[in-house]
Amino acid sequence: MKNNIQKGFYLVLSVAVVLLLISFIPKFKIGNKEFKRVDLLSDLKVSDGGDIDNPDGTDSTFVDDGGGTVVTDSASVVEPEKELVTVQLGQLTPNGTIRIEDYGPMERNGLNGFVWSLKQIGLKKNVRIAYYGDSFIEGDILTGSLRDLLRERFGGKGVGYVDITSQVSGFRVTVKHKYGNWNSFAATERSGFDASKQGIAARYFTNAGNAFVELKGSKNGVALDRADKSTIYFVSRSNAVIASSINGEPQEKHQIEGSESLQHITVEGDIESIRWSVLSAPNAIFYGVTMDGTEGVVLDNLSMRSSSGYHLKGIPEQRLQEFNKARHYDLIVLEYGLNVAGKNQKNYSTYKKNMIATIEHLKSAFPNTSFMLVSVSDRDYRASDGQMHTMPGVKALVEAQREIAQECGIAFWDLYTAMGGDGSMAAMAKKGMANKDYTHINSKGGKKIAELFYDAIMYEVER
């Protein structure tokens, strides 16, 4: 009897050892059949909860496995399965550019959705990007060059979304913008501003009598001289009449029924110029007009001078949700910090709290959109050694912004390091790429940074 018990014990032990060894065999294929790894201890293992709080600063991203999911032009996209890949901080692309850190690989708001959309652009009508920022990008500096690079690879037409009126229309070269007879309101200009009325760019405009806005294509960029369609976005609570004129042709009148929700009119054609005129629109609120292609990349510059980025939290979520349906974005980029960084400031806890709330507000309204936080750029001062160095507060802010991206589960790109780190803005100024305030870049500098950003994006697309 004792001998039988021993035999039984050794048999069970042998089977257990064999099964345990099987769990170490990696997945393999025989013909077209794939055999996956079996982990017999998986139910006993405790998950570490992801990489967001990993003390060594690593993050993770996914690469698609070549699945054949068909992507349509809608806010809900079914993505293929992804494999987890760890990215170390400071890792470079083959061209030497700082890579994008993705802290949301297992969330819908990580970079994967945008990367997948670019890969499937032939099956998708448009891939849209909203690029929010402060004066660092106003006038389409940086964003204009990034749009050009993406257009050369993925196609597209037109300048995208333009506010009804603009502070930068006099020096923006990517579109010719005329307007008249409007009352303008912005989140950073408190006088008379009603936060409940603002739109996607934290602005709104009302008719002061026979108002009009006109966009004309530009040759200062890739495929900016014409578009396939133009849209005007507004809310008119009572019936209204709005007219459109393509390329100076006779007006077409559009009869609008009153509604509390976001409305839009779209006209199509070979559009070199578009003029929208308000014939009758009592109490209507207007937001912006577009020149877009029917295919390829659309990049909207949504800059707000003197902003920290907090103002975006004030945009009503319902209005954002309506824009998500009418003009869904595959990627929303947030680049702020010039108006936050203090020379010697080290504690950015209040900023972090406010910015996290802002990003979560946007994520709630755009649940199927990828988000990326771009760090503050270098900002220099003359130190005690007589040389130009980065303000200490900038370095602390970059780390705070990385922590924001980690907590929000979105992508992060370290622009400060990518452009060269300490003293890099002064170095760019010496090369004629930045202003002597050692804070703002010019169009030449914008082109350089756009090339770096494009390289970082394309590495994620191609790997």
Feature-to-residue mapping (PLM):
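Conserved, compact domain cores that house catalytic/ligand-binding motifs in diverse enzymes
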Residues: K125-G133, E138, L142, G296-G386, ...
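Short N-terminal or domain-adjacent regulatory/targeting segments
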Residues: I98-I121, A201-S218, P250-Q255
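Short, Lys/Arg-rich N-terminal segment immediately upstream of the first membrane anchor
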Residues: M1-Q6
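Conserved SGNH/GDSL esterase-like catalytic core that processes O-acyl groups on lipids
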Residues: E138-S245, Q255-K353, H440
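Juxtamembrane proline-rich low-complexity "stalk" or linker regions positioned immediately after a signal peptide
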Residues: K29-V87
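Hydrophobic membrane-insertion alpha-helices, especially the h-region
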Residues: F9-K27
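Catalytic His-Asp segment of secreted/periplasmic serine-dependent ester chemistry enzymes
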Residues: G31, P316-E317, D378-R463
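Long, contiguous interaction/targeting segments characteristic
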Residues: G67, V71-V175, N442-S443
